[in-house]
């Protein structure tokens, strides 16, 4: 049965909406951010892909999903099922010269094309290579968000060039990249002076006049100073 609300009638027509508190007010919704996910297959494990895309979904919608590599090489065969499952477009890039990474160049060229030709809100750059540092900075200069993904060995220059950086070993489905470095125990965290100082600074910088700090504001301060800060890294 279809419910039909009867609106009260006045001398000037139907009653104004303010007189009908039982009707829900339709608030305008903000469309999700549109991201391009560009993956350097040579510098990330296929086991991290499911968790990586789930992380991207926390920020918006992956409108473009491409992965770059020389697919004639046997070491990239592990990607096949993952690409089919997640509808990711593989981009073939042959290695023209030993020691020169043509994959990086192809990814950077595509990123610049997308930057100027597509209506995107941000990029997800998946690599542990410092060659993408300038690309991340250039995208941010255009006012778009950059989220980086990579291993813990990723050079600091690339990490800090991103708005947000996520280590792939903490993503669901990803195997630990360095078993020799387990998560810190609570007792060890108490001795992590750098972490304590960072948290204290973020809280103090976010305090209002009454001495309270909003958690969201604290998180924003942390990201501004350390883009790869992630509570999941500390247990």
Model-predicted segments: where are they?
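Domain-level signal for Mg2+-assisted phosphodiester chemistry and nucleotide/NA-binding surfaces
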Residues: 21-116, 145
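Intrinsically disordered, low-complexity linkers and terminal tails enriched in Pro/Gly
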Residues: 21-32, 171-191
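Acidic beta-strand-to-loop metal/phosphate-binding motif
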Residues: 68, 121-128, 135, 139, ...
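P-loop/Walker A NTP-binding module and the surrounding RecA-like catalytic core of P-loop NTPases
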Residues: 65, 133-137, 142-147, 155-157
């Amino acid at each position: 049965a279809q419910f039909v609300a009867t609106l009260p009638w006045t001398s000037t027509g139907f009653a104004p909406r303010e007189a009908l508190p039982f009707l829900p007010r339709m608030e305008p919704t903000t469309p999700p951010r549109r991201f391009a996910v560009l993956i350097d297959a040579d510098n990330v494990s296929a086991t991290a892909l499911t968790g990586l895309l789930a992380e991207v979904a926390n920020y918006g919608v992956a409108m473009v999903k491409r992965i770059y590599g020389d697919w004639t090489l046997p070491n990239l065969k592990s990607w096949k099922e993952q690409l089919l499952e997640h509808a990711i477009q593989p981009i073939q890039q042959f290695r023209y010269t030993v020691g020169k990474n043509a994959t990086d160049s192809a990814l950077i060229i595509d990123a610049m094309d997308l930057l100027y030709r597509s209506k995107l809100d941000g990029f997800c750059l998946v690599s542990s290579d410092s060659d993408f540092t300038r690309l991340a900075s250039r995208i941010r200069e255009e006012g778009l968000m950059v989220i980086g993904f990579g291993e813990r060995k990723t050079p600091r220059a690339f990490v800090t060039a991103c708005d947000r950086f996520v280590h792939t070993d903490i993503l669901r489905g990803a195997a630990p990249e360095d078993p020799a470095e387990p998560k810190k125990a609570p007792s060890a965290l108490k001795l992590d002076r750098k972490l304590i100082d960072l948290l204290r600074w973020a809280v103090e910088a976010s305090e209002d006049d009454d001495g309270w700090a909003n958690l969201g504001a604290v998180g924003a301060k942390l990201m501004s100073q350390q883009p790869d800060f992630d509570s999941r890294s500390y247990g």
